[in-house]
Amino acid sequence: MAPEDTYPELQEEEIDVEAELEKLILEDSEAEAGTSSGETAAEPSPDPGEALKQLQHELEVVRQQLKEKEDAYLRLYADFENYRRRTQREKEEFSQKERQKFVLEILPVVDSFERAQQQLKLETDRERELHNSYQSVYRLLVECLKKMGVSRMKSVGQPFDPNLHEAIARQPSPDYPEDVVAVEYQPGYKLGDLVIRHAMVAVSAGSPSSEPSPPAQATIEAGPENTPASPQNPQPS
């Protein structure tokens, strides 16, 4: 007979003890878990005033960050607007300079047409035909310049202005007072409001001075004794 079969009662008792021990351990574990849950549930809830202060602080932080972002955006927008205006102004200035350069190259051609018109007498059919042919080209040039904003300045009869006129002579004029443009040798032009070529003019020095009259001779008032003899009434001898 095996030794384990010798005392079956003891074996059963040992099994019962082990089962009881496991039961006690399980109950003890459940008790500890319940105690921990009770302690957790017994923890005091946070103060509502403190929670409100914390939320207000966080809100203030968010507002400050938003203000910083808004200021950064406004600075960036202002920089962009300045850049856009600067580039637009530079573009316009470049375009203006290019147009001015082109017009200054065309104006001598216009001057040549006008001088030819003044010199042509139109006495023959050939001259009239030539005049009509170049006048069409002249009008085309003038219209092209007008569309570009070019205008011819009026000089004769206007007060002399160094911003508009270039005086190459000063001469007496019976028609215009002093410091008024009397003769225009070359017309001046504007591109918009900008003077691109000054008019070459002669300025009046005033009316030419008249020759001085001879001094008046003293006259003797005629009396009876100084009355000259009349041919019709000779003096008696």
From Swiss-Prot:
GO CC terms of this entry: cytoplasm
Signal peptide (UniProt feature, chain positions): none
Primary location recorded for the protein, binned into one broad class: cytoplasm
Localization terms from the record: Cytoplasm
SUPFAM superfamilies: Coiled-coil domain of nucleotide exchange factor GrpE, Head domain of nucleotide exchange factor GrpE
GO terms (BP aspect): protein folding
Keyword Ion transport among UniProt keywords: no
InterPro entries: GrpE, GrpE_coiled_coil, GrpE_head
Region of interest called Disordered, as start-end residue ranges on this chain: 24-56, 204-237
Superkingdom of the organism of origin: Bacteria
Keyword set, alphabetical order: Chaperone, Cytoplasm, Stress response
Pfam families noted in UniProt: GrpE
GO-annotated molecular function: adenyl-nucleotide exchange factor activity; protein homodimerization activity; protein-folding chaperone binding; unfolded protein binding
PANTHER family linked: GRPE PROTEIN, GRPE PROTEIN HOMOLOG, MITOCHONDRIAL
Function field: Participates actively in the response to hyperosmotic and heat shock by preventing the aggregation of stress-denatured proteins, in association with DnaK and GrpE. It is the nucleotide exchange factor for DnaK and may function as a thermosensor. Unfolded proteins bind initially to DnaJ; upon interaction with the DnaJ-bound protein, DnaK hydrolyzes its bound ATP, resulting in the formation of a stable complex. GrpE releases ADP from DnaK; ATP binding to DnaK triggers the release of the substrate protein, thus completing the reaction cycle.
Subunit structure: Homodimer.
Sequence similarity: Belongs to the GrpE family.
Protein name: Protein GrpE
Organism in which the protein naturally occurs: Synechococcus sp. (strain JA-2-3B'a(2-13))
Gene from which this protein is expressed: grpE
